[in-house]
Amino acid sequence: MARPKNVKHIFVTGGVVSSLGKGILSASLGLLLKSRGLRVAIQKYDPYINVDPGTMSPYQHGEVYVTDDGAETDLDLGHYERFLDEPTSQASNLTMGRVYKAVIDKERQGEYLGGTVQVVPHVIDEIKAKMNELAKNANLDVLITEIGGTIGDIESLPFLEAMRQLKLDLGTKNLLNIHLTLVPYIKAACEMKTKPTQHSVKMLLETGIQPDILVCRSEKPLSREIKNKVGHFCNLHEADVIGLSDCETIYGVPIMLLDEQLDKRVLKKLGIKKFQDPELSYWTEFCDKVKHPEDGEVTIAVCGKYTEYPDAYKSILESFVHAGAVNNVKVTVRFIRSEDAEESGCDIATAMKDVHGLLVAPGFGDRGIEGKISFIRYARENNIPFLGICLGMQCATIEFARNVCGLSEANSTEFSKRCRQPVIDLMEHQKKVKEKGGTMRLGSYPCILKEDTIANKAYGKFLINERHRHRYEFNNEYRELLEQNGMLFSGTSPNGDLVEIIEISGHPWFVGVQFHPEYKSRVRSAHPLFVGFVAAAKAFAFGDRQLSFEPDTLPLGEPERTLEG
C-alpha cells in the first residue's frame, strides 16, 4: 500500500472544562487510523512546570505511568498503549518544565550567543523542535499530539503558539487541529446549550488557531440541528462537528467515532488518499464481552492509600476490564482504604464479605501500611486469591515474616529506618542517591520464572520483561528463613539477586510482584497475571476454593522450556 510522504500532524486540544477525555479521544482516533493501515503514534504535552510527574501526589495527578525505557509519564500514555497496542517512550511525554529546563541549560552553555532569552522565539522554537522530534525519528504516517489543560489557561499558551507556527511551516494539509468541547444538557430547560462551545472556540481563535474539527461531548447524542448551529457559529461545516455522547465503557468511544465518520473527515482534510477499510471486529467483540459477560460477576477488593481518587489506580482498573473479558465475567472493584483497618473497631471480615479476591495496590510511605498487612493476613489465612503489586508485595513479605516465621519486628526500612528485622530494604545502588526525581529503579527489566509455579503457568514461559518503579527490595538475608517456612520465590532477576515474584506454598493463588503488571495489559492481550487472578477469583466465587490455575486458561499454549522466552 502506498504511504503518504510526509508525516501528518493532528493536535487535540480541549475547552470549556477539564477531564472531557482528550486522552481517550486521541487514543480512539489513533486506533481508527491504525485500523486503516496507517502507522500512528501519540504523544502528550503537559503545561505544568514539573519536569515529569514522578514526584507529584497521586491526589493531584493520578497514576504515574511508566514506559519501557523508564519514563515517568502522564496516565494518558496508558490509554495510548492500551488502545493502539504500541509502546510509548520518553519522547511521548513533554512537560513545560522540561522545555524551560532545556532552554535554561542552553543559555548556561552559551548557545544563544549572549542574546536575551525569551518565550518567543526561544521557548517556542524548543517546543517546535520537540514536536518534530518523534515524527522524524519514528517510521510514521500520522503523529497525534494531545495538549493538556484547557483553552484559556495561561500555562498552555506556548504550546498553542508553537502549534500555530508549525501549521504555517508545514501547511494546512499537514497539520490539523481537533478541538474537544462540552455541550451541556440543562434539565430545567430540557435543551442542550452550545454557548460554552462557541466561547471556547472564540478563545482558541484569539490565539490565532481555527479548529478544523470540533468533537462535542454531551450526555445525549447531538441532533443535526445542534451540529448545524455549532458549525455555523464556529466557522465549520456541519460534517466537521462530531458528536460524542456518554458511553457505557470508554472502549465504546472508537466505535462511536467511527459511526460519526471522524476518521474519514481527518483523512480527507489531511489529503491521505491511500488507506484500507477499518478492521475492528476484535474490538467490537471485546466491547460485547465487557457489556454482556456470560459468567456473571466477581468482586475484587483493592486495598490502597489513595482510594478516594480512583485515577491513582487507572491501569489496575483497566487491567481488570481486560481480564474480565477474557474470563467472561464483570469485575466489580470494592475500594478499601488501608488506614481503615488501623482504626479501632474495624472488622476486616465484614469489609471482605462477598469479596472473591484481594489486590493490595502500590504506593509510597508508611501511611496505612499496617492496614494493608492486616488485610493480607486475612486473605492468606482464608485462602482468598491475592495479588500484591510493588508495595503490596513488600507488605505481603512483612506479613509472612511476622505471622508465619515469627519475626515479630519484621518491617521495611522505608517505614522504620532502624527496624531490627528489615525484610525489605533500600536497594544497594540507591543508598547514595539524594535526588528524588527520576532516580528510582525505572523501566523494563527481565525476570526468570521458576518452573511449575503460578507465575510460570500464567505466563506460559520462563523469561519475562516487566516495568518497575521502586527503591526498596526484598532483603536476601531473610530469603532462606522465609523459604523454609513456605514462601516460594518464583521470579528473580537473571543473576538471581533480586526477588521479583513471591508465592506461598499451599495457597490456591497468592502472588506478590515487585513490578507493575498493570502497565502492560492491553485490549488484545490482557496481562497474564490479571487473567489468572480474575480466574482464581471466579473459581473462588463459584465455590471451587481449591483452585489450581492452569495455563490453558490463557491462549498461550504450552510453557516454553528455554530462557529465550
UniProtKB/Swiss-Prot annotation:
Pathway: Pyrimidine metabolism; CTP biosynthesis via de novo pathway; CTP from UDP: step 2/2. It comes from the Bacteria. L-glutamine binds at residues 59, 363, 391-394, 414, 471. GO terms for biological process: 'de novo' CTP biosynthetic process; pyrimidine nucleobase biosynthetic process. Transmembrane segments: none annotated. ATP binds at residues 19-24, 76. Residues 299-543 form the Glutamine amidotransferase type-1 domain. Keywords: ATP-binding, Glutamine amidotransferase, Ligase, Magnesium, Metal-binding, Nucleotide-binding, Pyrimidine biosynthesis. It is an enzyme of class 6 (ligase). The keyword Transport does not apply. Allosterically activated by GTP, when glutamine is the substrate; GTP has no effect on the reaction when ammonia is the substrate. The allosteric effector GTP functions by stabilizing the protein conformation that binds the tetrahedral intermediate(s) formed during glutamine hydrolysis. Inhibited by the product CTP, via allosteric rather than competitive inhibition. Disulfide bonds: none annotated. Its EC number is 6.3.4.2. The keyword Nucleotide-binding applies. CTP binds at residues 18, 153-155, 193-198, 229. InterPro entries: Class_I_gatase-like (IPR029062), CTP_synthase (IPR004468), CTP_synthase_N (IPR017456), GATASE (IPR017926), GATase1_CTP_Synthase (IPR033828), P-loop_NTPase (IPR027417). UTP binds at residues 18, 193-198, 229. SUPFAM superfamilies: Class I glutamine amidotransferase-like, P-loop containing nucleoside triphosphate hydrolases. It holds the Pfam family GATase. GO terms for cellular component: cytosol. Homotetramer. Catalyzes the ATP-dependent amination of UTP to CTP with either L-glutamine or ammonia as the source of nitrogen. Regulates intracellular CTP levels through interactions with the four ribonucleotide triphosphates. PANTHER family: CTP SYNTHASE, CTP SYNTHASE-RELATED. CTPSs have evolved a hybrid strategy for distinguishing between UTP and CTP. The overlapping regions of the product feedback inhibitory and substrate sites recognize a common feature in both compounds, the triphosphate moiety. To differentiate isosteric substrate and product pyrimidine rings, an additional pocket far from the expected kinase/ligase catalytic site, specifically recognizes the cytosine and ribose portions of the product inhibitor. This is CTP synthase. It comes from Chlorobium phaeobacteroides (strain BS1). The gene is pyrG.
